[in-house]
């Protein structure tokens, strides 16, 4: 719990986050929004969170029990707290101090973020009082944000394969563009309820996802209807789905942006967005294939691949020896079906770039900027490499499935390290159009950082109402000592290539674990990410990067002492380009 799941929440609370949402699922048999251990014990207790806890939509399952457990606000409404129920509960003995605490936490957050100030942006009204009514249209555009939005879109692209100098493109004479992801969706109209009448669903869960009554496009020269592959989105995938999604003010599609470049360069553009096995113009200097992988609320992808999209890439590659695959994806998407195809010369994970999808990918493809994204997850060679991660709840299906999390801290790259599984593309991996050299690793550690004593115990939280302040070392985020510096790790990075590019230096630590012994081989200790920095360097330039280490970064949670402890022994340091490419290594002892 502490070393993995609570870890990012602790940093978020320490940074001043105002609200935390409790989940739908149960934790050890108790709903998240009435789980006192999670909300009172961990969040408001150990982390000293001063903001409010809000339920996910309709995730409240009780009245006084959820209030006592730490829930401060129920959304979108509450049949348990509505009308005079809470007031009546106080009259019957419910803790009035807790009720006031719920209100204070919500109002204090309002002031924390300056929402009472005159210069605070006017809030749009998106949700009516009657939640069954359509939401009002909210114009959330900010012209000042446009450059930042484009920059984020560009930096979200991860180049994982680039052979035979396929990229960047250099004023090609002829380009062919394929794939259902290269153009706009059939409709983007917030005035319509759900999907536009007569058009197929935007996402397709199976080959049967298009109804016979839907309007259908047809393959060129064929009566066969166009049906998107399973787990995909019809049109360029811009954003995730669900209640947090939006309709962009405009859409720059890959086809539009590349067509503009073609106009400037005098390039011929050929395209086929419908056929699953398209013909290819022989004169094509390069063939771009755009596919995607989509999921949203209440809809999980059937798997981490889809055969139809893979077949499309391989079909084009069988006719074009310079095929470039671009995947707009919501998360892990396996590509082993075509990754080793020698005619697939480049692969880009474009993720969710938003309204500037086309402009962003064009800047990458044409070398206006070197790609600088890195994988925030591991791409396996096959689905089974992830173990039971893809289906941990097979036992006890139904309304109350039981999911036992037995993997400890070894998820994603730590799972692959622990089981010595070679991935297709490792965590932190990503190519650029340049090359970088790492040198001069220096580790400076405070030798007195480890005094052999636990770093405090779990702070006490009483009655779900107020923080025990007897221990003045407790700050927002938890024990103050956890955020104290214990040292630094520095390294020098040089751009040894011919173009300006950004490198993402990454620091990993292997913390000693006394539970790992020759007689207990079931526990495998693995390195963990402890920092990363992105720096842009011109050709020939070099720069030093420095990673700070906190007590938290070199500690383990002792389940017996119920406290953070800095273990004694040798700590291994790894600095490099990814979790598996760490040319600089060292050790220090505490």
Predicted region positions:
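C-terminal non-catalytic regions of proteins with extracellular/luminal or membrane-system context
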Residues: 6-7, 29-34, 57-60, 86-90, ...
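Short, functional N-terminal and low-complexity linear motifs
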Residues: 5-11, 50-54, 69-74, 108, ...
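Short, flexible segments with low predicted structural confidence
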Residues: 15, 24, 71, 128, ...
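Short acidic (Asp/Glu) and glycine-rich catalytic loops that position anionic groups and cofactors
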Residues: 17-22, 65-67, 79-88, 129-134, ...
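Second-shell residues forming the walls of enzyme active-site clefts
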Residues: 1-98, 105, 424, 475, ...
């Amino acid at each position: 719990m502490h070393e993995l799941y609570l870890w990012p929440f602790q940093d978020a609370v320490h940074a001043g986050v105002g609200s935390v949402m409790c989940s739908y699922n149960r934790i050890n048999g108790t709903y998240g929004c009435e789980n006192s251990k999670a909300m009172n014990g961990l969040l408001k207790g150990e982390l000293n969170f001063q903001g409010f806890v809000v339920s996910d939509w309709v995730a409240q399952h009780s009245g006084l029990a959820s209030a006592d457990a730490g829930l401060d606000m129920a959304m979108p409404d509450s049949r348990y707290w509505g009308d005079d129920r809470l007031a009546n509960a106080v009259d019957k003995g419910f803790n009035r101090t807790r009720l006031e605490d719920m209100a204070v936490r919500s109002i204090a957050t309002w002031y924390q973020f300056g929402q009472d100030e005159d210069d605070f942006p006017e809030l749009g009204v998106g949700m009516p009082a009657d939640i069954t009514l359509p939401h009002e249209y909210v114009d959330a555009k900010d012209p000042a944000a446009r450059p930042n939005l484009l920059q984020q879109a560009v930096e979200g692209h991860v180049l994982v394969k680039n052979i035979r100098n396929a990229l960047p493109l250099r004023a090609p004479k002829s380009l062919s563009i394929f794939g259902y992801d290269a153009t706009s969706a059939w409709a983007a109209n917030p005035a319509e309820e759900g999907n536009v009448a007569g058009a197929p669903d935007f996402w397709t869960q199976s080959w049967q996802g298009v109804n016979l009554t839907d309007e259908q496009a047809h393959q060129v020269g064929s009566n066969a209807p166009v049906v998107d592959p399973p787990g995909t989105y019809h049109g360029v995938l811009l954003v995730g789905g669900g209640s947090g999604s939006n309709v962009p003010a405009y859409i720059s599609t890959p086809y539009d942006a590349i067509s503009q470049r073609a106009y400037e360069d005098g390039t011929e553009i050929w395209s086929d967005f419908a056929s699953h096995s398209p013909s290819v113009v022989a004169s094509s200097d390069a063939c771009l294939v755009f596919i995607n992988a989509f999921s949203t609320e209440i809809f999980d992808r059937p798997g981490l691949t889809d055969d139809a999209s893979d077949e499309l890439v391989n079909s084009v590659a069988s006719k074009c020896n310079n095929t470039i695959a671009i995947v707009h994806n919501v998360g892990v998407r396996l590509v082993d079906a075509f990754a080793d195809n020698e005619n697939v010369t480049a692969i880009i994970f474009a993720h969710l770039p938003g309204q500037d999808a086309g402009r962003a990918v064009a800047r990458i493809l044409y070398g206006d900027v070197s790609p600088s994204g890195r994988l925030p997850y591991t791409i396996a060679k096959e689905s089974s490499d992830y173990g039971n991660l893809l289906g941990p709840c097979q036992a006890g299906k139904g309304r109350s499935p039981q999911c036992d999390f037995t993997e400890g801290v070894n998820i994603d790259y730590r799972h692959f390290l622990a089981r010595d599984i070679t991935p297709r593309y490792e965590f932190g991996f990503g190519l650029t159009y340049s090359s970088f050299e790492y040198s001069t690793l220096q580790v400076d550690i405070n030798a007195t950082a480890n005094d052999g004593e636990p770093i405090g115990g779990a702070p006490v939280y009483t009655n779900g109402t107020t923080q025990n302040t007897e221990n003045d070392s407790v700050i927002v985020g938890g024990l103050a000592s956890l955020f104290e510096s214990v040292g630094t790790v520095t390294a020098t990075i040089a751009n040894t290539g011919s173009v300006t590019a950004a490198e993402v230096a990454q620091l990993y630590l292997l913390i000693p674990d006394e539970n790992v012994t020759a007689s207990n081989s079931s526990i495998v200790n693995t390195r963990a990410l402890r920092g990363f920095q992105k720096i842009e360097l011109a050709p020939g330039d070099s720069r030093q990067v420095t990673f700070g280490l906190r007590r938290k970064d070199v500690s383990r949670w002792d389940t017996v002492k119920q406290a953070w402890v800095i273990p004694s022994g040798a700590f291994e340091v790894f600095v490099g380009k990814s979790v598996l490419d760490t040319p600089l290594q060292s050790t220090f002892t505490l």
